[in-house]
């Protein structure tokens, strides 16, 4: 890499020669054309603070503050060296003994962009987890934290071997607003206020080693800030989208999870997004990067902002916000984009400085932030575990995490039972039934499909065919069709396989061929002719032959025809279940494990996605634009399956806990003037605990997932949302035949707040209901009295230059 570093340094005098007059139309093309060095995965090494050139510099003094140590290092750089290191692929400074560094690593649900070449034990396997959309469906905060903690242990082990960075471009905490979005699979789902915010907190603190850890484990990145949730719908590229978002929707839906990431989880990095919001590209938006992140959301003092890869260039092309590339680089650095994932800074800062648009101090500010993080990560502390316990982690430490079982558990806990007429769970072959099974559909023998996108390099991939074969079933496998084809050439083989089996399982839906980064769906109907094949399977089967359908993929498809087809005995959603996916899918069907997942997105009828523009970011319904309302909070139609839907193999009964109150009255002034020593803000104080007694009156042990919603028709401005999520929990293994468990979900003061048109989060007087699950099994009435109080004032949007430290 030393050669590559010198090569990049040599390019700097030619920076103006990189200008290209034949520009790609990124208003349509959704994949940026990045320079090769931006994509490098390099072999990492560490500065020598014992006897190297930096050993006498303050950066190697572990008693100094991270900021002072980083500033001392950066002060040694020449201007050319400083500019050369402003991209994600940093060549280092050879004369100072500062090694090359790669900022861009991935950890969405496993390590990505690591150096996976063969290296003995490290190459033996890397745990790869289910996609976030499936793990989140478990509604288990502890599980999310476990996954992130395991990934960070793995990341540190690879980092110590020089194969992975210390910063990760994860998690993706944009909300899955519109069902066509290709990257919704990377997110926890469509709820911002509670689910995605909780996911962000657990994932970030798992990655970083805690809230304020003594030693930072890895630096997480909250992405993509902000208003990013479309790839290429109707030829509108994510790179050029300029979306209109009201201050009310920004505050209520598009940013609260980022507030939690900054204020509560203390995330160390943010990524600004490709798109523009209200005319201003996110990476040159001082309102986003300074006013919101640093002044309002309490982003950590020396946290840094990275542009998405190619987004700084995008300020010029396609957004046209800057007149040329040097101006785009200047706009971005002055707005608060500290590091460019790309090469715009490296190639164009010389001209920006020459014209006076940027000063050295502006560049230093961002670079000091990055290196202050590396100081906190122990990058300059040598390889002794006494100075940093993470510097000694290796593959044996990864093996101790039980990662492989946790990956399986995440898949099992997230699978959602949508429909069941009593057919499931299947009797096992050992009971003399269902000895043969037909596995049909484009997911029936899935391996790489199981992973979704941005996956870690898995040690193994267990397909459904492999899993059922290993369990002693006689498997009749016939794909029958593909994800998007209309060819019926293989139907006959599938129908024959079904006739030969005791049980039919169809596994299909969507996959990364039609939902992915840079690729949205044009429809939310089942693609190709999969439904036609299922219909034929249903028509020919005998009455005592079970037909079960697994709907796979991150986004939802309209399964209404399956819901109402009596010959389809059961329907499940399986997401992207990861390396042990086949086992998880099998064990749910056979009853080895009981389903308790719930949908984190609404399953809409197919006509929903055709009724209004996917670029309409307004959540509230609007007759003029034919927007029927977006997400479970505002949708005015009838969903196929609602957000939070999920069935069990047993019967649960919920009732008010003994001695629990079902009515509360609170004075707003008293609430908001009370001391809150255990929380950052008064809004985070617990208002009351929602409690219920959960009894399993059925015949199977099972986990129980609880979603707690609030609604009002009197408090705050109209229109009123249908409801909104205020809390959730998962109770483990509630025993069958009368076993009970106590549910206790704290409801914070700000969970009952609403957002006004100016974007202020306000606690309004009025009557509220807080209810358990979509079925409203237990309802608590809450009345807030007195004058309304603003809990969080939304700042005025003013574009300008980000302030100094």
UniProtKB/Swiss-Prot annotation:
Biological pathway: Glycan degradation; xylan degradation
Any one GO MF annotation of this record: xylan 1,4-beta-xylosidase activity
Catalytic center residues: 308
Catalysed reactions listed for this entry: Hydrolysis of (1->4)-beta-D-xylans, to remove successive D-xylose residues from the non-reducing termini
InterPro entries for the chain: BXL (IPR044993), Fn3-like (IPR026891), Glyco_hydro_3_C (IPR002772), Glyco_hydro_3_C_sf (IPR036881), Glyco_hydro_3_N (IPR001764), Glyco_hydro_3_N_sf (IPR036962), Glycoside_hydrolase_SF (IPR017853), Ig-like_fold (IPR013783)
Pfam families linked: Glyco_hydro_3 (PF00933), Glyco_hydro_3_C (PF01915)
Function: Xylan 1,4-beta-xylosidase involved in the hydrolysis of xylan, a major structural heterogeneous polysaccharide found in plant biomass representing the second most abundant polysaccharide in the biosphere, after cellulose.
Family to which this protein belongs: Belongs to the glycosyl hydrolase 3 family.
Protein name as it appears in the record: Probable exo-1,4-beta-xylosidase xlnD
């Amino acid at each position: 890499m030393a050669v590559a570093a010198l090569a990049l340094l040599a390019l700097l005098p030619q920076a103006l020669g990189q200008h290209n007059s034949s520009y790609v139309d990124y208003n349509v093309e959704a994949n940026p054309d990045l320079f090769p060095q931006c994509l490098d995965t390099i072999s990492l090494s560490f500065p020598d603070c014992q006897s190297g050139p930096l050993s006498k510099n303050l950066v190697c003094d572990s008693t100094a503050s991270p900021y002072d140590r980083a500033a001392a290092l950066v002060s040694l750089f020449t201007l050319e060296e400083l500019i050369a290191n402003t991209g994600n692929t940093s060549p280092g400074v050879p004369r100072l003994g500062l090694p090359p560094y790669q900022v861009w690593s991935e950890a969405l649900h496993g390590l990505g962009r690591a150096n996976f070449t063969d290296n003995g034990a490290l190459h033996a396997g890397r745990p790869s987890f289910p996609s976030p959309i499936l793990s989140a469906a478990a509604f288990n905060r502890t599980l999310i934290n476990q996954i992130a903690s395991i990934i960070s242990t793995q990341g540190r082990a690879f980092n110590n071997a020089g194969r992975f960075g210390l910063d990760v471009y994860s998690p993706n905490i944009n909300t899955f607003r519109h069902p066509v979005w290709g990257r919704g699979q990377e997110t926890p789902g469509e709820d911002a206020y509670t689910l995605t915010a909780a996911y962000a907190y657990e994932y970030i603190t798992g990655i970083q080693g805690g809230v304020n850890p003594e030693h930072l484990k890895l630096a997480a990145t909250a992405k993509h800030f902000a208003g990013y949730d479309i790839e290429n719908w109707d030829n509108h590229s994510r790179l050029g989208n300029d979306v209109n978002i009201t201050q009310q929707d920004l505050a209520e839906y598009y940013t609260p999870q980022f507030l939690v990431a900054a204020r509560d989880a203390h995330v160390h990095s943010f990524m600004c997004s490709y798109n523009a919001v209200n005319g201003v590209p996110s990476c040159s938006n001082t309102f986003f990067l300074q006013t919101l992140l640093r002044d309002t959301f309490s982003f950590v003092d020396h946290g840094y902002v990275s542009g998405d890869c190619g987004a700084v260039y995008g300020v010029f092309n396609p957004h046209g916000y800057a007149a040329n590339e040097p101006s785009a680089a200047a706009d971005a650095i002055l707005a608060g984009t500290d590091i460019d994932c790309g090469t715009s800074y490296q190639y164009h800062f010389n001209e920006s400085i020459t014209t006076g648009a940027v000063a050295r101090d502006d560049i230093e500010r961002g670079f000091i932030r990055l290196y202050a993080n590396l100081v906190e990560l122990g990058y300059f502390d040598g390889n002794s575990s006494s100075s940093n316990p993470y510097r000694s982690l290796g593959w044996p430490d990864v093996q101790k995490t039980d990662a492989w079982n946790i990956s399986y558990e995440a898949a099992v806990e997230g699978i959602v039972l949508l429909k069941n007429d009593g057919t499931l769970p299947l009797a096992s072959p050992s009971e003399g039934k269902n000895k043969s099974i037909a596995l049909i559909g484009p997911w029936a023998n899935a391996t790489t499909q199981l992973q979704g996108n941005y996956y870690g390099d898995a040690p193994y991939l267990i397909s459904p065919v492999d899993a059922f074969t290993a369990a002693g079933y006689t498997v009749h496998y016939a794909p029958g069709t593909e994800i998007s084809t209309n060819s019926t050439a293989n139907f006959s083989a599938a129908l024959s396989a079904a006739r030969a089996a005791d049980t039919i399982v169809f596994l299909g839906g969507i996959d990364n061929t039609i939902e992915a980064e840079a690729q949205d769906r044009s429809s939310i109907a089942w693609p190709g002719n999969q439904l036609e094949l299922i219909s034929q399977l249903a028509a020919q089967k005998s009455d005592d032959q079970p037909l079960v359908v697994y709907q796979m993929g991150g986004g939802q498809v309209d399964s209404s025809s399956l819901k109402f087809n009596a010959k389809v005995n059961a329907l499940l959603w399986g997401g992207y279940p990861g390396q042990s996916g086949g086992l998880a899918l099998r064990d749910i069907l056979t009853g080895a494990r009981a389903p308790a997942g719930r949908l984190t997105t609404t399953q809409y009828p197919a006509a929903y996605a055709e009724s209004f523009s996917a670029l309409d970011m307004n959540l509230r319904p609007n007759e003029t634009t034919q927007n029927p309302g977006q997400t479970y909070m505002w949708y005015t139609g009838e969903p196929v399956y609602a957000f939070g839907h999920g069935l069990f193999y047993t019967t649960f009964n919920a009732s008010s806990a003994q001695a629990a109150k079902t009515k509360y009255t609170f004075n707003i002034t008293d609430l908001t003037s009370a001391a809150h020593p255990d929380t950052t803000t008064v809004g985070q104080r617990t208002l009351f605990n929602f409690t219920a007694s959960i009894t399993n009156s059925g015949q199977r042990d099972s986990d129980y997932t609880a979603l707690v919603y609030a609604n009002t028709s009197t408090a705050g401005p109209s229109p009123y949302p249908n409801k909104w999520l205020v809390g959730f929990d998962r109770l483990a293994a509630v025993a069958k035949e009368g076993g009970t468990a106590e549910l206790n979900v704290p409801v914070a003061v700000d969970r009952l707040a609403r957002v006004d048109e100016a974007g202020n989060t306000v606690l309004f007087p009025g009557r509220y209901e807080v209810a358990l699950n979509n079925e409203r099994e237990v309802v608590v009435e809450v009345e807030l009295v007195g004058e309304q109080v603003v809990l969080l004032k939304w700042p005025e949007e003013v574009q300008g230059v980000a302030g100094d430290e």
